[in-house]
């Protein structure tokens, strides 16, 4: 095998590969053995017709397609390795010369993994943010628990007040026309919950059972349905019932009823601890995002379009899987949100580009710093995935994953380790 490389454009090369005549003839023989059972020739049992007879009857060309595929399978990867080329897509192959007893000459035009000029990544002037938990945040959580455990009582008389649950029928109109999804019957709306748009809920305060009212609101600009975004709307509302919440006392008995704690003080302390953990996770995410932004901005990389397309494809598949888990199809989701496939892919483009660039740059840093994934990390990650995908026998699933996807698992860990290395060096 002989290969020559020509750079066509950024991240695209053309390889001219020559396969020795003996090797191509061997590929022709393999192609004959693969296909000889397809031919019926008088005087010969099926599959026993000599190659010379088939060549004479049909021409050697009948074996070219399979022989070329066999020869390319054997020579293309060898050429990539010899020339240290890392493709990111399938090649476009063109045959230059072909014939029995001759060299097979073909070209393979392929998009390659981009070269990276790594920017600053050591000693970055980036600090992990810190978020304190306020007493107000703790009290808000306690109040939400109190509200969820309230006793609901029907109000036989009186009017709707803030915090009440109004049982309503409603029908919405935009430009004088009823719109899809804008109608409801016996809907329980908690006043002050912010469930409905604009100041819809506030306009119901003071109404009594049996009252009717035209409620005027404006849809948000980013409501999610193009035909409703930023549109003024009118809702015909009928009040059919009013319910009030009787809140439980916030004391030790309340804490015992809603949690595993014996006192309200212990409950609040636990809430504070959980909020602190949540804040720390948030701070870590923001710190990580700031580091990634910095290394992307200072590095130089020309991203091949095919890598971006593949990442968007992956993000779309991930979205589709999550929707299916919720009982929705992608088409239903697009109809509900007023999106098209093109709009969704365009929306994902920026995040996809950021992720691919970050992975490529971090991989380059890992190579420069000789960052590895330890056997312990590989086994732990495989077991985590095993618990997720094979809960009945996680160890067995972990072993399967290590055999089938070790490279992917290892790559993820190396990128995580590299990011950790960069974060630890921040000033």
Curated annotation (Swiss-Prot):
Leader peptide range in chain numbering: none
PANTHER family named in the record: TRIGGER FACTOR CHAPERONE AND PEPTIDYL-PROLYL CIS/TRANS ISOMERASE (PTHR30560), TRIGGER FACTOR-LIKE PROTEIN TIG, CHLOROPLASTIC (PTHR30560:SF3)
Lineage: Bacteria, Bacillati, Bacillota, Clostridia, Eubacteriales
Subcellular location per the Swiss-Prot or TrEMBL entry: Cytoplasm
SUPFAM superfamilies assigned to the protein according to its UniProt record, in alphabetical order: FKBP-like, Triger factor/SurA peptide-binding domain-like, Trigger factor ribosome-binding domain
Biological role: Involved in protein export. Acts as a chaperone by maintaining the newly synthesized protein in an open conformation. Functions as a peptidyl-prolyl cis-trans isomerase.
Transmembrane parts of this sequence: none
Pfam assignment, any one: Trigger_N
Domain notes: Consists of 3 domains; the N-terminus binds the ribosome, the middle domain has PPIase activity, while the C-terminus has intrinsic chaperone activity on its own.
Every PPIase FKBP-type domain range: 163-248
Protein name, as recorded: Trigger factor
Main location: cytoplasm
UniProt keyword terms in alphabetical order: Cell cycle, Cell division, Chaperone, Cytoplasm, Isomerase, Rotamase
Enzyme class, spelled out: isomerase
GO biological process: 'de novo' cotranslational protein folding; cell division; chaperone-mediated protein folding; protein transport; protein unfolding
Source organism (scientific name): Clostridium botulinum (strain Eklund 17B / Type B)
EC nos: 5.2.1.8
Family: Belongs to the FKBP-type PPIase family. Tig subfamily.
Reactions mediated catalytically: [protein]-peptidylproline (omega=180) = [protein]-peptidylproline (omega=0)
Molecular function GO labels: peptidyl-prolyl cis-trans isomerase activity; protein folding chaperone; ribosome binding
Gene Ontology cellular component annotations, sorted alphabetically: cytoplasm
């Amino acid at each position: 095998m002989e290969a020559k490389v020509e750079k066509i454009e950024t991240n695209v090369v053309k390889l001219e590969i020559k396969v020795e005549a003996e090797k191509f003839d061997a590929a022709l023989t393999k192609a004959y053995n693969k296909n000889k059972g397809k031919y019926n020739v008088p005087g010969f049992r099926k599959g026993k017709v000599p190659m010379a007879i088939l060549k004479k009857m049909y021409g050697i060309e009948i074996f070219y397609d399979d022989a070329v595929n066999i020869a390319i399978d054997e020579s293309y990867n060898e050429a990539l390795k010899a020339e240290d080329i890392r493709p990111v897509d399938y090649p476009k192959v063109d045959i230059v010369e072909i014939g029995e007893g001759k060299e097979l000459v073909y070209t393979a035009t392929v998009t390659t993994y981009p070269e990276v000029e790594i920017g600053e990544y050591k000693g970055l002037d980036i600090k992990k943010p810190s978020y304190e938990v306020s007493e107000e945040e703790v009290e808000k959580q306690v109040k939400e628990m109190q509200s969820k455990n309230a006793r609901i009582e029907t109000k036989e008389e009186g009017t709707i007040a803030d915090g009440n649950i109004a049982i309503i029928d409603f029908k919405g109109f935009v430009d004088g026309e009823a719109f899809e999804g804008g109608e409801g019957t016996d809907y329980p709306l908690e006043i002050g919950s912010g469930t409905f748009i604009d100041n819809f809920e506030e306009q119901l305060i003071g109404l009594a059972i049996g009252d009717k009212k035209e409620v005027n609101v404006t849809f948000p600009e980013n409501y999610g349905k193009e035909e409703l975004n930023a549109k003024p709307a009118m809702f015909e509302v009928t009040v059919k019932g009013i319910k009030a919440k009787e809140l439980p006392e916030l004391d030790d008995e309340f804490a015992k009823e809603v949690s595993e704690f014996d006192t309200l003080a212990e409950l609040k302390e636990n809430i504070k601890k959980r909020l602190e953990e949540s804040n720390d996770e948030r701070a870590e995410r923001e710190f990580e995002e700031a580091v990634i932004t910095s290394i992307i901005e200072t590095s130089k990389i020309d991203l091949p379009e095919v890598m971006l397309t593949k990442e968007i494809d992956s993000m779309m598949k991930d979205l589709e899987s999550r929707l299916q888990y919720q009982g929705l199809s992608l088409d239903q989701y697009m109809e509900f949100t007023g999106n098209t496939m093109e709009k969704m892919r365009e929306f994902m483009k920026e995040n996809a580009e950021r992720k691919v660039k970050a992975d490529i740059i971090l991989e380059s840093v890992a190579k420069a710093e000789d960052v590895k994934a330890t056997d312990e990390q590989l086994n732990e990650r495989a077991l985590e995935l095993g618990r997720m995908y094979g809960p009945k026998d996680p160890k067995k699933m972990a072993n399967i994953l290590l055999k089938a996807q070790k490279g992917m698992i290892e790559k993820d860990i190396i990128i995580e380790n590299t990011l950790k290395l960069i974060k630890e060096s921040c000033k």
